[in-house]
C-alpha cells in the first residue's frame, strides 16, 4: 500500500536525529570491541575447535578475556554449552547461593522463566532454588526506578545476592540504563560488602556507551543468541564480573576445582568472535527498527514504550495493541516477512514457562534468537506486542510494512486511507 510507505517515510523523517545518535553509539562500542581484539592479537588459530577436556583451549580462553575487557571486569565465563539466558542466570544463582541464603530482587518479580528457577509460585519445578532452601524476596520499582531505600530494608543478615533485571520482560515499565544501578551498587558495597549485585543484562548489551559493570554491578549475565552474539553466535551464554565469583559460577558449570580450565567445543569459535565483533552494528540496526515501530504506531494513536523520542536502554519495543486480534495479526505479519519459515502462521499456544498463551513470530536463522527480528506477546490485556531485533534496518522496515498490511487485511486495524 502506498499509504503505508508514506507513513514510514514520515516516521523516518521524524527519527533522523535519533538515528544519528544510534550511529554515534555504534562507533564508540565498535572501537571498544576492536581494541579488545587487537590487544589479544586475535588470529585464525583462535577459531580452531577443541575436544575432550579442553585444557589450554586458546580460543575459549582468549574469547573470555575479550568479554572481560569489553565489560571492564576482572574475568568472564563465555560458553557455548550454556543453553539460554535463563540457563546463564540459573548457573549464576546456583553458583553463588547456599541453603539458607536469601536472594532479593530489586526490580520486582523477574521474567517468567526465571521464576521457575527461583521457585516463586506454589507449583515450583523440581530442582528450584526454593527446593534447595534458598529464600527469595521481591522489591517493586518505584516510579519505574530502583527503590534503593526499600532494597536496603529488604537486605537481611542472610542475604547473599541482590538481582536486578535491566529489561522490561513482559511488564509495562521502563527498562533500566547502566547508570540506574549505580546508587544501588554504592549502597550494597558500602553497607553490605558481603552481598553481590547481579544484573540480568539480556537485551541491553551495546545499547548504551557502557554497561552495568561500569557502574558498580558485580556481575552481568546474558545470552549469546541475543545482543552480544551479533546474530552469528549459534548458542551460548556469558557471565562477566569479579574473578572470585566467576570461579564459583564456573565450578557450578563444570566442577569445583576445575572451573574455567576445562570445556571443549568441537566446532569453530569463529562465530563467537565474529558475532561479538558485529554486535555493536547489529544492535544499532535493531534499535533503529524498534524506533521505527514506536514512531509508526504512535502516529496511529497506540501507546508504546519506550516512546519514540527518548533514549533507549534495550532493544525491546512494547506496543499496546489493545485487542488480541491486533496482537496476533501483528505477529503474523512479522512472521510473513521473515527469511525463515515465512509460510508459517503463528497462533497463540501454551508455551512452557509462561502463565498465559503466547503468540510468537520468530523466523530466525538461529532458533529463538532475539537479536534477529522477532515479535511476541502474552494473550492477556492490554495485549502488548514485544518486538525486538533486526539483522538489518531495511529488513525491519519491510517487516513493519508487512505487519501493518496484515493488521489492515484482517480488520484488526483501520486502514489509514479510510
Predicted feature residues:
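Conserved PLP-enzyme active-site core in the AAT-like
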Residues: 2-18, 23, 33-39, 43-46, ...
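Short, well-structured beta-strand/strand-turn elements
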Residues: 74-81, 340-342
Amino acid at each position: 500500500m502506498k499509504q503505508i510507505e508514506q507513513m514510514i517515510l514520515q516516521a523516518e523523517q521524524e527519527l533522523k536525529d535519533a538515528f544519528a545518535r544510534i550511529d554515534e553509539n555504534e562507533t564508540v562500542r565498535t572501537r571498544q570491541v576492536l581494541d579488545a581484539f587487537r590487544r589479544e592479537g586475535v588470529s585464525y588459530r583462535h577459531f580452531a575447535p577443541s575436544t575432550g577436556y579442553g585444557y589450554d583451549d586458546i580460543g575459549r580462553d582468549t574469547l573470555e578475556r575479550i568479554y572481560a575487557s569489553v565489560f571492564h571486569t576482572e574475568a568472564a565465563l563465555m560458553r557455548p554449552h550454556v543453553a539460554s539466558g535463563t540457563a546463564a542466570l540459573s548457573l549464576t544463582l546456583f553458583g553463588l547461593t547456599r541453603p539458607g541464603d536469601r536472594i532479593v530482587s530489586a526490580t520486582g518479580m523477574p521474567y517468567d522463566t526465571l521464576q521457575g528457577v527461583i521457585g516463586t509460585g506454589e507449583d515450583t519445578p523440581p530442582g528450584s532454588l526454593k527446593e534447595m532452601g534458598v529464600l527469595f524476596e521481591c522489591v517493586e520499582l518505584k516510579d519505574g526506578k530502583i527503590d534503593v531505600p526499600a532494597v536496603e530494608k529488604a537486605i537481611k543478615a542472610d542475604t547473599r545476592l541482590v538481582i536486578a533485571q535491566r529489561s522490561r520482560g513482559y511488564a509495562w515499565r521502563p527498562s533500566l540504563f547502566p547508570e540506574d544501578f549505580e546508587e544501588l551498587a554504592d549502597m550494597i558495597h558500602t553497607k553490605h560488602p558481603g552481598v553481590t549485585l547481579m544484573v540480568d543484562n539480556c537485551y541491553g548489551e551495546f545499547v548504551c556507551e557502557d554497561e552495568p559493570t561500569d557502574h558498580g554491578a558485580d556481575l552481568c549475565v546474558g545470552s549469546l543468541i541475543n545482543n552480544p552474539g551479533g546474530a552469528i553466535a549459534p548458542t551460548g551464554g556469558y557471565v562477566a564480573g569479579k574473578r572470585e565469583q566467576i570461579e564459583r559460577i564456573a565450578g557450578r558449570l563444570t566442577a569445583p576445582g576445575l572451573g574455567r580450565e576445562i570445556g571443549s567445543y568441537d566446532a569453530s569459535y569463529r562465530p563467537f568472535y565474529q558475532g561479538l565483533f558485529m554486535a555493536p552494528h547489529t544492535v544499532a540496526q535493531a534499535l533503529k527498527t524498534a524506533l521505527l515501530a514506536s514512531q509508526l504506531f504512535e502516529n496511529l494513536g497506540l501507546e508504546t514504550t519506550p516512546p519514540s523520542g527518548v533514549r533507549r536502554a534495550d532493544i525491546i519495543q512494547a506496543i499496546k495493541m489493545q485487542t488480541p486480534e491486533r496482537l496476533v495479526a501483528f505477529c503474523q505479519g512479522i512472521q510473513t516477512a521473515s527469511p525463515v519459515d515465512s509460510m508459517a502462521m503463528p497462533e497463540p499456544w501454551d508455551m512452557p514457562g509462561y502463565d498465559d498463551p503466547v503468540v510468537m513470530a520468530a523466523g530466525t536463522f538461529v532458533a529463538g534468537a532475539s537479536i534477529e527480528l522477532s515479535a511476541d506477546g502474552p494473550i492477556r490485556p492490554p495485549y502488548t506486542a514485544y518486538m525486538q531485533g533486526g539483522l538489518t534496518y531495511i529488513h525491519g522496515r519491510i517487516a513493519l510494512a508487512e505487519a501493518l498490511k496484515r493488521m489492515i487485511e484482517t480488520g484488526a486495524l483501520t486502514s489509514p486511507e479510510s
